[in-house]
Amino acid sequence: MRRAAATRPADADGFNLQYTQGVGSFSTFDEFLRLTYGNDRWQTSTRVVYSSSPNDFKYRNYDKNVLILDDDHNIERNKSGAYHDFHALQEVYYNTGHGDRFGLQAWYVNSKRGLPMLSVDHKENDDYLNQQREQTLRSILSWDHLRKKWKVGVKAGYIHTWMAYDYERELGNGKMEKMIRSRSTINTFFGQVDGEYYLGEKWLFTATVSAHQHLVRSIDKNIIPMDNQQPTDPNGNKTKVPVGYDKGRIELSGYVSIRYRPTERLGLSIGLREEMFGSEWTPIIPAFFTDYLISKRGNLVAKASISRNYRFPSLNDLYFLPGGNPDLKKEHGFTYDAGLSFATGRDGVYTLRGEATWFDSYIDNWIVWLPTAKGFWTPKNVKEVHAYGVEVKAGLDVQLAKDWQLSADGNFSWTPSINHGDPVDWYDKAIGKQLVYIPEFSASVTGHLTYRSWRFTYKWCYYSERFTTSDNDMKTKIGRVKPYFMSDISLEKAFSFRWADLSLKGVINNLFNEEYQSVLSRPMPRLNYEIFLDIRPKWGKRNKKQ
């Protein structure tokens, strides 16, 4: 359930309440509560989400008994995959009625998640801990000032994150050995000012200035220095000393853009950005955009853009424990794209929309996070990357009959991402190969069929094979993650009573019981279900009518 992730509540009139209870396979429970109040001046929203599950689904382990030629592989349970996630989001907005709007947002997250045991881990005992915990508070104060031809927005905020990663194993002596005890604290203070100014109907000027102060402390309490450097306590006993990083960095960003529409059909825009990370400045980063209305019939529009890219490694990229890489280089390159879009239809009958985009990027020192054999991920630079391809999107809404509606949305992507870096050695086979974990082909379709208070949904997605080694080796089982198709369905029925609106929804995930992995050696659940009950009392509406 991701509804708490939204950053702005829907406008409310009076008091409203919504409660959703979900129950699913593997003893999975989801709960969602929303309280809202609104009038002409005030809008408030309180949202709470709690999700938990042992996540101990069964799977067939093809990575054990590899010499077996039939299908008699072990059936095992997903170990160390339990999770508990709590989210609370509070928002308050006040409108003065004279063009000023003040806002307060506070979002708290408390999460505890196990990292499942790899299917190639052959230890039989369950004395194992691989767990990540997180507590995060995000708070933002905002002010928006709106006038007929211009507007100004100001934001200031604070983000605090505490993260812990623990890895423990029983090594055969009956005792749990603490191998990793990573602790990270991140504090960020930020401010942002943005503005827009309209000059007539043809010109729009925008500007944004932002500043972030990051403070990161990341240590591993379990790392001990070498013997000749290891300190001792007053009794002469060697002590453990945490090893890690305590870093701070200020980041500044400035962006200005000019948009010009000389005719009804043609639009032009240019943007300039410059950023500072610590004591390093990026060069001026330009971007150019244009769009042209080819035909009003069907609203056929051609679009194109060219932009320069520049990205410094974040402090997490550099120093997070475990996995941070302090040797990362900054990423930079150019991106080009062009495409067509259209939208047509008949009122009350159908609407059809679609777009196709070609893109081409040349990136040096691409920063990518990759999984390691130790169970965590780490970032690396890929010296030269050529990423290009085509993305196609389409949507259709049809009124089939008086009470019948059909809608569908789909997309298809062809995204080669080729490593063109210099070989480390003359025999390096990674040059000219697809980057790891990036599928060359992917697609998805979502369809809805509605009849009065009934709603049926079908979701389908496809991912082509993803390579796990830089040379795209397919001779071994660990060289790739196999392609897979996925289908999910749901059926929802809405009920309207005098005292409340209710809906009951049943979901079947992985309808065809597909065996698949998203990450090498991490099996995913097969066919599973969820049931949701949604309740929305009408007391506010009933009182208003009375």
Regions found by a protein language model. Give the residues of each.
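Short strand-turn segments of transmembrane beta-barrel domains in outer membranes
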Residues: 6-37, 46-48, 76-81
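C-terminal beta-signal and adjacent terminal beta-strands/loops
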Residues: 53-59, 364, 406, 462-471, ...
